[in-house]
Swiss-Prot record:
Function of the protein: Catalyzes the last two sequential reactions in the de novo biosynthetic pathway for UDP-N-acetylglucosamine (UDP-GlcNAc). The C-terminal domain catalyzes the transfer of acetyl group from acetyl coenzyme A to glucosamine-1-phosphate (GlcN-1-P) to produce N-acetylglucosamine-1-phosphate (GlcNAc-1-P), which is converted into UDP-GlcNAc by the transfer of uridine 5-monophosphate (from uridine 5-triphosphate), a reaction catalyzed by the N-terminal domain.
Pathway where it operates: Nucleotide-sugar biosynthesis; UDP-N-acetyl-alpha-D-glucosamine biosynthesis; N-acetyl-alpha-D-glucosamine 1-phosphate from alpha-D-glucosamine 6-phosphate (route II): step 2/2; Nucleotide-sugar biosynthesis; UDP-N-acetyl-alpha-D-glucosamine biosynthesis; UDP-N-acetyl-alpha-D-glucosamine from N-acetyl-alpha-D-glucosamine 1-phosphate: step 1/1; Bacterial outer membrane biogenesis; LPS lipid A biosynthesis
Reaction(s) catalysed (UniProt annotation): alpha-D-glucosamine 1-phosphate + acetyl-CoA = N-acetyl-alpha-D-glucosamine 1-phosphate + CoA + H(+); N-acetyl-alpha-D-glucosamine 1-phosphate + UTP + H(+) = UDP-N-acetyl-alpha-D-glucosamine + diphosphate
GO biological process, one term: regulation of cell shape
Positions annotated to bind UDP-N-acetyl-alpha-D-glucosamine: 6-9, 20, 71, 76-77, 136, 150, 165, 222, 328, 346, 361, 372
Transmembrane segments: none
Gene Ontology MF annotations: glucosamine-1-phosphate N-acetyltransferase activity; magnesium ion binding; UDP-N-acetylglucosamine diphosphorylase activity
Species assigned in the record: Bdellovibrio bacteriovorus (strain ATCC 15356 / DSM 50701 / NCIMB 9529 / HD100)
Alphabetically ordered keywords of this record: Acyltransferase, Cell shape, Cell wall biogenesis/degradation, Cytoplasm, Magnesium, Metal-binding, Multifunctional enzyme, Nucleotidyltransferase, Peptidoglycan synthesis, Repeat, Transferase
InterPro entries: Bifunctional_GlmU, GlmU-like, GlmU_C_LbH, Hexapep, MobA-like_NTP_Trfase, Nucleotide-diphossugar_trans, Trimer_LpxA-like_sf
Positions that bind acetyl-CoA: 381-382, 401, 419, 436
Protein name: Bifunctional protein GlmU
Region described as Pyrophosphorylase: 1-224
Amino acid sequence: MTVIALAAGKGTRMKSPLPKVLHPVAGRPMIEKVIQASKQAGAAEVRVIVGHGQNLVRQVVEPMGVACYVQDEQLGTAHAVRCAKPETIEGVVVIMNGDHPLIEASDIKDFVRIFRDEKCDLAVVTAVLKNPGEFGRIVRHKGDLAAIVEAKDASAEALKIREINTGIYIVKASVLSEYLPQISNNNAKKEYYITDLIALCIQDKCRVQAIQSTPKVAVGVNNQLELARATRLLFKRKALRLMEDGVLMIDPRTVYVEESVEIGAGTVIYPNVFIRGRTKIGSFTVIESNAFISDCEIGDSVQIRGGSYLESSKLHNKVSAGPYARLRPETEIFEEAHVGNFVEMKKVKFGKKSKAGHLTYLGDAEIGEEVNVGCGTITCNYAADKKKYKTKIGNRVFVGSDTQFVAPIEVGDDAIIGSGSTITKNVPAKALAVARGKQFIKENYSAKTAETEEKEQV
């Protein structure tokens, strides 16, 4: 089986400089969804027709192992298929649009199976819609496919038909090679339409069939509203699958999980959560409202409190983060550690059972086990030379509130750092380090100040 994906159009109704097929649907370009479904369905080869913005399209699709064929002028769907050199293909050919992101591998497999079982020469996939709109109508005679009539050319009677052409075709390569050159552009737009292939095959009494499918396969994307609808449907599909696998969603309508995300059974997700990228989440984890998680690895029984923002980080089992924690790339939080509210970390290894409860920034740091990091602690990792330096803190260290570590610096095991300190030198194990201005007291100072001010006013 070979798939030809049509992706050369400008997509002018998108009103965007980005080629239409590259617009993201639930996190990935829609053409990528079509290619992925084709490969999962067993396609030996996928040929993508490119044209408008072809360099950008190639950057996305060629790493997926597909071949690109150029349609320099957009002269219709049949012309696009010609550009794929069908005479070099053998077996079964599936033709579909690159802007149908809801197509699944199981759909393609079913279409090809029916095509083969019915010994078809050509088949068109159809669907019955409540509002057929501008879709081409399927005209049947005694149940068999008789013609496809475009909406703009249809009579009032034909417009009442609700069965439509989805734009997906399955055809023998030999039939495609024979009849494709016979398609003319004798129409108002002077374009070559793939639907004319049906008429030619019916005329020559080829075995032509209409395979009726579900409305989802008809969901194409031509404007931003349709893009949003397709995205919503994909998020809904993902949410349903996760819930079937044992994930609890308080309100799945407001949970947005991209297809690439993996989540274990028993995990609870509150409303208004977005999880994307290559994220993997274990079992019995709780993710509270307004959390954003991207490309993270999260273990079992983790607590992610509301408003937390996590990206490219790893959280081991029984970690708690937030509310309003921010974990930036290359951060790793080990078992049973706690990252509290308004704590930000970047490039940090935060040890087992360590705690940073509030209002803290740790960057380019290695923090040992069972460390207590007091409120307002900062690792000063960025120097005037525009280089970043590392802070290393050993096990069981107590860091008092409002401490600054001026990197590069190391603190040994079991050390104590006094509150309000600016630490600029290494601290040995078990040592006490205090670096702050000496406190002094002036007795009755406020009373004397008030008396002076009163005299000045007189």
